[in-house]
Amino acid sequence: MFKNDEEYFADKEYISNSMIGDYLKSPAYYEAKHVSKIIPKQSSPAMVLGLALDCMLTEGLNVFGMTYSKQCLKRDNPELFEQNKTGAFEVLTEAAWNQIHTMAGLIEELPLYKEIKDKADKQVILTGQFGTGYKVKGKLDFLVVENDTAYIYDLKTSSVIKPIQYHYHCLDYGYYRQMAMYKNLVIQNYKVKKVVCKHIVINKDPWWNKCSVFTLNEDRIDKEMNTITDTIRNINAKAFDEVFEEHEIGEEKEASTFGLKEIDLL
């Protein structure tokens, strides 16, 4: 379907989780970014860090080396300095370059990563349909299919890594919704009855790195299905008028609402 990342991210016919997130942020923002295209594509330092880490761990050092380069001064490395000016590479600061290598090294020591790195399909692009023919897409970091069970593993960098805080982080960033999309796409494309969804998470503190693996609760994931369907329906209906919202805040949530479990630590 999509030959490369450029085609995948440029396509607007198929709806992705990140596009749904943009609509939920603001219908008018979605229209400006994906329809009128007056908002340029932007990458925050956190996004660059996460994408570079994904590249190293899912596509390997060779691809990483053809995609990314380390920033340097001309007097320190004239050849690399000129190479970086060509625009052929995503140039990372020395701090980001070192941090990515440190984070990747820690993840590579994780027992779960050692278990899946050779048997998993990596950077798996899937397409399918939601509801009454709405086209959707997703890109999975790792996918393992064993008999009638599929295992989705997604790499995440995060400023929080404890279970309760990470649960709310998942809510803020739409990660349960993302896994609902992925789960549905896997079921459409593979003959499986069960899908297990896990996050391999490393905190992005430059001075202290720690890994955790979280299993996302299946019921909590499934709760996102209505949100996905309703949002895609609104996008296809071109419902881009801004909606005024009023909320009451401060209610304490019960622990039973937490949707994940920490299963492995380094």
Where are these regions (language model features)?
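Metal-dependent nuclease catalytic regions and adjoining charged, substrate-binding loops involved
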Residues: E94-A104, L171-Y176, M181-L266
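Non-catalytic protein-protein interaction segments used by genome-maintenance enzymes to assemble
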Residues: I125-Y176
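A residue-level signal for conserved active-site and pocket-lining positions in enzyme catalytic cores
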Residues: L53-D54, F142, I228
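Short catalytic/ligand-binding loop motif for oxyanion handling, primarily in non-cytosolic enzymes
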Residues: G65, V160-P163, W207-N209
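Metal-dependent nuclease catalytic cores that hydrolyze phosphodiester bonds in DNA/RNA
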Residues: M1-G138, E246-I249, K253
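Secondary-structure boundary elements
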Residues: L110-D118, V144-Y151, V186-V195
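Hydrophobic/aromatic-lined pockets within catalytic cores
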Residues: L57-L61, T157-V160, I187-K191, N236
